[in-house]
Amino acid sequence: MVLASISEALISQGDGGERVAKRQRSAIVLLDLDILDCPICCEALTSPIFQCDNGHLACGSCCPKLSNKCPACTLPVGHSRSRAMESVLESILIPCPNVRFGCTKSFFYGKESAHEKECIFSQCSCPSSVCDYTGSYKDLYAHYKLTHSTNIFWNIKRFRCANFFTTSMLISDKILIKRVHEKKLLLAVQCFREPCGVYVTVSFIAPSAPEVGEFSYQLSYNVDGHTVTYESPEVKRVCKVSIETPQENFMLIPHSLLRGDLLEMQVFIIENVDQE
């Protein structure tokens, strides 16, 4: 269910500011999101929306695929816009999916994806494969510290940003968790063994909210006089660690430079602060 304003669909005059003001003052009703799906592809309707002479709707993506022929009645479709339905879409306010966790934000239909990525109330999953806990990134930090700190397998360490630290992990363990104490963040160091070598990547378990901050990092691996380094202007922020080999933002260590299962690296994390 979503919150929706219906009076905006009846407004047909006034400048942009007046339309926004009237939209915000309009009545609120409940709608089922399913009725906002294209009846053909079942994807969410977005402008432009078309209709045939019998009133059957079709989204802009479906019309060309149907050769502009309505599948319900075979009448032409793709030439006449459904302005009424487009006005309804413009009037709909959707509460954040994290409303039950405390988020009070709402946004107009079609703008929800941008907010969800940055919502501070987004639920983050515990990186332990034997734990199904989810919570805000700060609650996850507290949970991990309390529940998994004594688990040697996870080898939790604490460090501060803007400092080099050396980390050791077994490639077969695949993941190592570090705690950033002052930020209440969990840093996941992951490695993936593939035929061409070992992929190493790091990420914070947190949403992409401004409150979390932005960070850059450097990885360095040294063995027998050989050095492999990788620098990135951004530490990825994820709500759940992936078990898939990364396609970007990784350091690749060839098998010829590996010495058994132990992987020892130097990591440098620094918070990016705008200089104004």
Curated annotation (Swiss-Prot):
GO molecular function, one term: transferase activity
Zinc finger motifs (SIAH-type), residue ranges: 91-149
SBD: annotated segments: 88-274
Binding site for Zn(2+) 1: C96, C103, H115, C119
Catalytic activity reported: S-ubiquitinyl-[E2 ubiquitin-conjugating enzyme]-L-cysteine + [acceptor protein]-L-lysine = [E2 ubiquitin-conjugating enzyme]-L-cysteine + N(6)-ubiquitinyl-[acceptor protein]-L-lysine
Residues annotated as binding Zn(2+) 2: C126, C131, H143, H148
Enzyme Commission (EC) number: 2.3.2.27
GO biological-process terms attached to the record: protein ubiquitination
Residues in RING-type zinc fingers: 38-74
Keywords annotated in UniProt: Metal-binding, Transferase, Ubl conjugation pathway, Zinc, Zinc-finger
UniProt enzyme class: transferase
InterPro entries, per the entry: Sina-like_RING, SINL_plant, Znf_RING, Znf_RING/FYVE/PHD, Znf_SIAH
Pathway this chain belongs to: Protein modification; protein ubiquitination
Gene3D superfamilies with a match to the protein in the record: Zinc/RING finger domain, C3HC4 (zinc finger) (3.30.40.10)
Domain notes: The RING-type zinc finger domain is essential for ubiquitin ligase activity.
Function: E3 ubiquitin-protein ligase that mediates ubiquitination and subsequent proteasomal degradation of target proteins. E3 ubiquitin ligases accept ubiquitin from an E2 ubiquitin-conjugating enzyme in the form of a thioester and then directly transfers the ubiquitin to targeted substrates. It probably triggers the ubiquitin-mediated degradation of different substrates.
Family: Belongs to the SINA (Seven in absentia) family.
Protein name in the entry: Putative E3 ubiquitin-protein ligase SINA-like 9
Organism annotation: Arabidopsis thaliana
